[in-house]
């Protein structure tokens, strides 16, 4: 792992994010006119992958608050049993931080850490097992979340793995 560095913030694109999941946006979507032509449906922007271990899809709202700048990255998390999608409910830009896994699949590979600038009309769906930083907003903002609930009796930690470093590995300067 390299020493502390400043992460470059790159635009969120489908190609740039592809190894981590799906960018949810209208651009390039299949369009269907419905409801007697009064509604435009941007069809199947992402799939929800939550069936592992008897999981079921749920929708939640997360209310994000900004962290002080510069943002220090010392923690990442992943969800091994399902995807997790974030779609902003207001038109505010936000940040997405992801990393590939290390060689033995036990922790993030911080050398591959990436930070994406998402527009307020873009969401992401993290693929199962993708290391990502918790929600990073630049101003208070709500998100619609599609993710997995386990069967009755399953502990929350079954679908959440966290990795903490003793010291920050990178910073994001806004």
Locations of regions flagged by a protein language model:
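Ligand-binding loop in jelly-roll beta-barrel domains
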Residues: 129-144
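Solvent-exposed, flexible loop/coil residues
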Residues: 120, 135, 139, 164
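Non-catalytic, conserved peripheral segments adjacent to functional cores
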Residues: 1-111, 115, 147-174
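His/acidic/aromatic-lined binding-pocket segments of jelly-roll/cupin-type domains
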Residues: 84-87, 123-124, 135
